[in-house]
Design a protein with these regions (language model features):
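Short beta-strand-centered segments that line the small-molecule binding cleft or hinge
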Residues: 1-7, 78
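Periplasmic-binding protein-like
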Residues: 6-8, 98-127, 148-155
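Short loop->beta-strand "edge-of-pocket" segments that line small-molecule binding or catalytic clefts
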Residues: 25-45
């Protein structure tokens, strides 16, 4: 895998965070109006995982079934007063003049076959990801950081739980009888 970026996901709230929300439990406790991301999005999967870790039922969030198609749309819903809070990325919150409560750091990587690492296109991409201009661009985005940008990383380092499937050996029929009926 090739390092790409780290980003922060968290709570998008009104400027000044008037409800004092710091966690998913706070949203449930206060009855704050929540705006969700659609089923199947990475943010929704993350939210459901965080709810499970906190021991909260999804229905504890008022508005859990309401969703917007993007982080920008979540921020717009909060800015317009249609929701008190939503899960999203910091850059979307800051673009609308909203506050942001960080919850999770996510690491992003690019995957390719090991044999592709020596290909000119892959080398060019890796070089681009390590240029000062690209690194500065990543640093300028609120909530993003160029973590290991362009570096080749071992899968076992990035995903310690991952195990490669071993190739199954072909069954040898030597010294075995095979009877076919037609």
């Amino acid at each position: 895998v090739i390092g790409f970026a780290q980003r922060t996901q968290g709570l998008i709230v009104a400027s000044g965070n008037p409800l004092g929300l710091q966690s998913l439990a706070d949203i449930a406790r206060t009855g704050a109006r929540f705006m969700n991301r659609p089923l199947g999005t990475g943010t929704r999967v993350l939210l459901d995982d965080l709810l499970a870790q906190a021991g909260l039922d999804a229905q504890a969030l008022q508005g859990y079934t309401l969703n917007e198609p993007s982080h920008t749309a979540i921020a717009q819903a909060v800015a317009a007063g249609a929701a008190d809070v939503g899960m999203g990325i910091e850059v979307a919150a800051r673009a609308r003049g909203l506050d942001f409560v960080p919850l999770v750091q996510e690491r992003y990587h690019l995957a390719c076959l090991k044999a592709s690492l020596d290909q000119p296109a892959t080398q060019a991409l890796r070089s681009l990801l390590q240029t000062p201009d690209w690194l500065a661009h990543m640093q300028a985005l609120h909530g993003y950081a160029p973590l290991h940008c362009g570096e080749v990383l071992a899968m076992s380092t990035v995903l310690p739980w991952w195990q490669f499937a071993r190739k199954k050996h072909a069954t040898s029929f030597r010294n075995k009888s095979l009877l076919l009926h037609f």
